[in-house]
Amino acid sequence: MSKTYATLGELKPGNFIIIDGEPCRIVEMSKAKTGKHGSAKAHVVAIGLFTGNKKTLVAPVDQRVEVPVIEKRVGQIIADMGDLLQVMDMETFETFEVEKPSDEKLREKLKPGVEVEYWVVMGKRMIIRTR
């Protein structure tokens, strides 16, 4: 699993974080000081990259959290197999199967021969956009 660590206070909306073992994109973040002697807390709302589930995290601002390492790659669609696509990496020429994305506009563009940008996040692959 490819991950690194960051301080929770350094992150902002749009960054990625691992909550409960799932990579998520931060959509909302607020910081508040709890009281006279308490340390500041951060309230993070994030959406899972693969599941789309909403996850929340409340933790001290200075806590170290896991951040996924996202590898951005380019591939070409070889075959459409229903809910799966067969994709060939343009650098290593390795072939693999990946699920079709849920976005309808993107699904319409995914035909054999089309180049796509895909991400490898914690060993899983997902198609992001066409090139």
Curated annotation (Swiss-Prot):
Species per Swiss-Prot/TrEMBL record: Staphylothermus marinus (strain ATCC 43588 / DSM 3639 / JCM 9404 / F1)
Protein task: Functions by promoting the formation of the first peptide bond.
Organism lineage: Archaea, Thermoproteota, Thermoprotei, Desulfurococcales, Desulfurococcaceae
Positions bearing Hypusine: K36
Database matches in PANTHER family: TRANSLATION INITIATION FACTOR 5A FAMILY MEMBER
Keyword Disulfide bond: no
CDD domains in the record: S1_aIF5A
Gene that produces this protein: eIF5A
Protein name: Translation initiation factor 5A
GO molecular function, one term: translation initiation factor activity
